[in-house]
């Protein structure tokens, strides 16, 4: 820290304390990563909402506490209200539970309560007000049917207009726009990383390695070939009539076009 302080490495606090498949929530410690949590959630046909571009090695708790917006959201508020409750150790050593759960069995409840609302006080503080040691988060079901559509546009204004028309009708849970630089970066092949993923391994703590020369060349070609902006929308069907849901959303998109 620039002005003094203590850095605490919490990666060994990596237990998934509870998963509630019925109410779509989980209780985790700060060292739990996206890849670790998703590996367990798949056994229950659930998934964790992930910010765009976050590495699998990132801490779920830290990411949510810093309010990194996720793309699996119909609006910004939904994507930043994924925390139910959390326990924070104050500088005095006291344990403070945020979200006012009346008992241990109520951790998955909404954070509103009759007392003062400290729910957002510690969010975005980067640990300067205390250390969060447990957090209850909301989950999403794994889609049974999924279609990803790409809509090319020439300007950011057109991309925004298209996104607004789609989101007014709440079509798809993921809807966002990328310019050709960012989209090309996501599409560049990484043979070493692909090999690790097939083995069940993920990006290490310190992120991906420097690109090879052929990857740089591929990135430049992709960027030149891609449209200036691309709107990406994911249509997904969950437990009930997934094919039917995806089909009527595709028809609604055609009507918008």
Where are these regions (language model features)?
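FAD-binding subdomain of flavoenzyme oxidoreductases
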Residues: 15-19, 27-168
């Amino acid at each position: 820290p620039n002005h003094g302080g203590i850095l605490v490495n919490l990666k060994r606090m990596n237990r998934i304390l509870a998963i509630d498949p019925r109410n779509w929530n989980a209780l985790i410690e700060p060292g739990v990563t996206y890849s670790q949590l998703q590996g367990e959630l798949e056994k229950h046909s659930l998934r964790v909402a992930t910010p765009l571009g976050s590495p699998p090695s990132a801490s779920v708790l830290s990411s949510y506490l810093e309010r990194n917006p996720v793309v699996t959201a119909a609006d910004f508020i939904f994507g930043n209200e994924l925390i139910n409750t959390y326990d924070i150790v104050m500088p005095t050593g006291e344990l403070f539970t945020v979200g006012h759960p009346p008992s241990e069995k109520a951790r998955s409840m909404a954070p509103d309560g009759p007392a003062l609302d400290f729910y957002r006080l510690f969010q975005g503080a980067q640990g300067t007000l205390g250390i969060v040691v447990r957090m209850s988060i909301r989950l999403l079901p794994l889609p049974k049917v999924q279609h990803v559509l790409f809509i090319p546009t020439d300007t950011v204004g057109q991309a925004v207009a298209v996104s607004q028309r789609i989101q007014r009708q709440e079509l798809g849970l993921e809807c966002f726009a990328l310019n050709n630089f960012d989209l090309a970066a996501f599409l560049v092949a990484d043979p070493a990383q692909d090999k690790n993923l097939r083995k069940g391994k993920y990006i290490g703590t310190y992120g991906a390695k420097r690109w090879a020369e052929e990857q740089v060349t591929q990135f430049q070609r992709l960027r030149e070939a891609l449209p200036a902006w691309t709107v990406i929308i994911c249509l997904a069907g969950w437990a009930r009539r997934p094919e039917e849901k995806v089909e009527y959303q595709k028809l609604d998109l055609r009507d918008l076009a």
